[in-house]
A protein has these predicted regions:
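Unchanged
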Residues: 176
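His/Asp/Glu-enriched, well-ordered alpha-helical/loop segment
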Residues: 6-29, 33-34, 40-43, 47-50, ...
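Histidine-centered catalytic micro-motifs
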Residues: 1-5
């Protein structure tokens, strides 16, 4: 877990040193949160294969406070679009219990970068709908080394999926947070 340029630098340096001392292939190191990184840090994460795992709902809920407390650096709060531009897989999470596990609100926040007051922050850090959906499905599975079993619907996988009442890729954007889960399936069985 690291939030802000100084802690993020510490994690990047530690991972770089660990890999230098004991090289491993396909380790998929993560930095949970990874808010407010510099462009240089994003480049280093891409180089080292470090995957940031931000919580886009926090942009909606807390960016106003970040502007008040930290100033313009709040524009870089959870910059998923910058990660994608650097070739880093975009993985998203909720940070329960700090915020509710509302996937569709989080996707909307990552796409719109809109705060609770309606302010748009760091528009260049936004991602598109497909990237947001992949951030909660296959990319999340990959960062956990579980893409062989979950993250997409394919023959041979566990058949873990949800049925929702609309299409997150085509629904009117401001209706995205209103989508509802109608069924959850685990291992090919409704639960």
């Amino acid at each position: 877990h690291a939030q802000g340029p100084i802690p993020i630098a510490m994690v990047i340096d530690a991972i770089r040193e660990a890999q230098a001392q004991s090289p491993r292939v396909d380790v998929r190191h993560r930095i949970e949160h990874c808010g407010f990184p510099t462009d240089e840090q994003i480049g280093a994460m891409a180089e080292l294969g470090i995957v940031p795992v931000p919580q886009p709902t926090h942009v909606h809920l807390y960016a106003e406070g970040a502007f008040r407390d930290y100033g313009e650096i709040a524009e870089r709060m959870y910059p998923s679009g910058r990660f994608a531009e650097a070739g880093i897989p975009v993985v998203l999470s909720s940070d329960v219990p700090v915020s509710m596990p509302d996937v569709f609100l989080a996707m909307w926040a990552a796409i719109t970068r809109r705060t609770s007051s309606g302010r748009i922050v760091g528009q260049e850090c936004a991602i598109d709908r497909e990237t947001a959906l992949r951030g909660y499905t296959i990319e999340g599975a990959r960062v956990l080394h579980r893409e062989h079993a979950v993250g997409s619907i394919e023959v041979g996988k566990l058949a873990d999926f949800a049925i929702i009442d609309g299409d997150p890729l085509t629904i009117e954007l401001d209706s995205l947070p209103d989508l509802n889960v109608e069924q959850v399936w685990l291992g090919g069985r409704v639960v």
